Amino acid sequence: MTLPIDTLPADAVAAAPDEGRPTKKRQKRDVHGWIVLDKPIGMTSTHAVAVIKHLYGAKRAGHAGTLDPLASGLLPIALGEATKTVPFVVDGRKEYSFTIRWGEERDTDDAEGRVAATSESRPDAAAIKALLPRFTGTIEQVPPRFSAVKIDGERAYDLARSGETVELAPRAIEIHRLELVDQPDADHAMLTAECGKGTYVRSLARDLGRALGALGHVAALRRNRVGPFGEGDMIPLEQVEALCHRAAAGEGHLADTLLPIETALDDIPALAVSPADAARLQRGQAVLLRGRDASIVRGIVQVASGGQFVAIAEAERGEIVPRRVFNLAGIAGRAGRKG
């Protein structure tokens, strides 16, 4: 059973599960920042969060969008106060590379499921390219039967697994870019997609297969980008482990392994305030905007003081109203992560 590639479950910010090993309980600590993990195939997103949380001894951790166990690639993991910025990342664009296997439609819409229907037809590159514009822009998409979408309070994948008929309503999604990259043989096509929140690549592969009369499912899937995080930010699990062990041995600092919290807010304007105003914001109090640009500052802003991230606030009617305040006591990610 597979999980959706683009859903933030209610328990995404969760504690690491108890593995049942008789290890000495260590003291949890305040760790704040982002790890952009290059998740390996076979690992669930929840387990990846648990591993990172354990390595850092962090009190709190969560991910910014589930990645299927059979998928690899970019999984943004927030530690500590960074979990408050998860919604800003989840709402960002995603980019995927994926391979479609023609000739078989499966009940999970990926290689893990059972074959539900077959076709002898195989599309050529010209037919695939001619179809892609129909699947670009705002389109209607039905989520996979095996997905975390809720039906009368039940997850669709639980209903499907129990043998119940699952009828899911189509939803409007946005696909910004869809390209054919390669066709290594008649049975496979490799594509890239840049899409918005709520898009299922498994459904996209299924619908392309049906439209071409060839049927198909996702044979391989890799996520390359989520919001502000891209391939250059990714770090393999083995490297995270090595960096944490080096820091524990006094050969570095954990802060050097983390991206700053505000990395998740790259597209939000930044505003600097005085230490006195920063203290007021952290107490939940609004402060007056000052300076010649005060009258034109509008909307959501990220606020810093003395180079330290303070709050996410809203500028309105000549004042800044705090919406999320941050306490970065402890270990906090900083610019220029070392690898």
Where are these regions (language model features)?
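Accessory RNA 3′-end/elbow-binding domains used by RNA modification enzymes
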Residues: 1-63, 67, 211, 215-339
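Catalytic cores of RNA-modifying enzymes
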Residues: 1-197, 201-235
